[in-house]
A protein has these predicted regions:
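Structural alpha/beta surface segment adjacent to cysteine/selenocysteine redox centers
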Residues: 83-94, 99-175, 205-210, 235-242
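Ser/Thr/Pro/Gly-rich low-complexity linker/stalk segments immediately outside membranes or between
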Residues: 52-66
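A generic local structural motif
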Residues: 72-76, 104-106, 201-203
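Conserved strand-loop elements at the edges of beta-sheets that form or border functional pockets
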Residues: 80, 89, 224
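C-terminal cap of thioredoxin/glutaredoxin-like
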Residues: 1-47, 172-242
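Short secondary-structure boundary/capping elements
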Residues: 68-70, 100, 196
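Generic structural signal for secondary-structure transition and capping sites
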Residues: 54-55, 144, 157, 179, ...
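A short beta-strand-turn-helix
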Residues: 67-85, 110
């Protein structure tokens, strides 16, 4: 599924430069120094206010519709619960870009142990991918979710050629995970599996997620889609939190 471009990324303006004018010889330079200090203090104060607002954004989201849609207690989550940076990814297992981007979050987690947790939400936007989503949700009952997800993403080109999932090829793609396939097939239509799938889709609609992958980092979406935009969003969240 093709990505849709969002609003342009905004940039933070630097503080105003200090204007220094030459003084006649012998003039008291205290006013110049005081003026420079005042400008510096104003710049520091503005920076502090900005980042205070960023730090409080996640807690403020808790009482909003967007915060409710991003609540991921039911979702598979990787990382420490105490981590201050929370990445929520809306993912379609048949999405080629999802497979390409998934290692980015894992890389950041490896490089920042204990600081990041990742929650995955499923949306079946591609033809035939709902079966893959059900397999993923059912694999959680055997504590094999992350292994199943990585196996599906790694073999995606075989079971989802041209972004169209082939359900009959999916079971073969996860043969090496160690799942009890009979139990898996019995679980794919379980009520709790269906409920989680419906919740993810409803939350995606509430958040206006129309393409995958879509990321929210501490409640913030990417201003536009791209690898650098995602990295910037994660880097900023890490800098704010730690």
């Amino acid at each position: 599924m093709s990505r849709k471009t969002k609003r342009n990324q905004t940039t933070e303006r630097p503080g105003p430069p200090v204007q220094q004018t030459p003084s006649p010889q012998g003039r008291d330079t205290r006013n110049v120094v005081i003026g420079a200090i005042a400008v510096l203090l104003l710049a520091v104060g503005a920076w502090a206010l900005l980042h205070k607002g960023e730090d409080s954004q996640s807690s403020e989201l808790a009482g909003t519709p967007r915060g409710a849609a991003l609540a991921s207690e039911h979702a598979p989550t990787l990382g420490e619960e105490s981590a201050k940076v929370h990445i929520v990814e809306f993912l379609d297992p048949a999405c080629e870009t999802c497979a390409a981007f998934f290692p980015i979050a894992k890389q950041y987690m490896a490089e920042n142990p204990g600081k990041i947790r990742l929650s995955v939400r499923h949306v079946a936007f591609h033809d035939g991918s709902e079966f893959a989503v059900r397999v993923l949700e059912a694999s959680r009952k055997q504590d094999k979710y992350w292994q199943t997800l990585e196996a599906l993403l790694a073999s995606q080109h075989r079971w989802a050629p041209n972004h169209v999932a082939q359900p009959d090829l999916i079971v073969g793609a996860i043969a090496g995970v160690g799942l009890n396939i009979d139990q898996l097939m019995a679980d794919i239509n379980a009520p709790d599996v269906t409920q989680r799938i419906q919740q993810d889709l409803g939350d995606a609609m509430a958040l206006k997620v129309t393409a995958t992958p879509e990321y929210f980092v501490n409640g913030r979406p990417m201003p536009s889609f791209g690898e650098q935009q995602l990295r910037t969003l994660i880097n900023d969240a890490l800098a704010d939190a730690y």
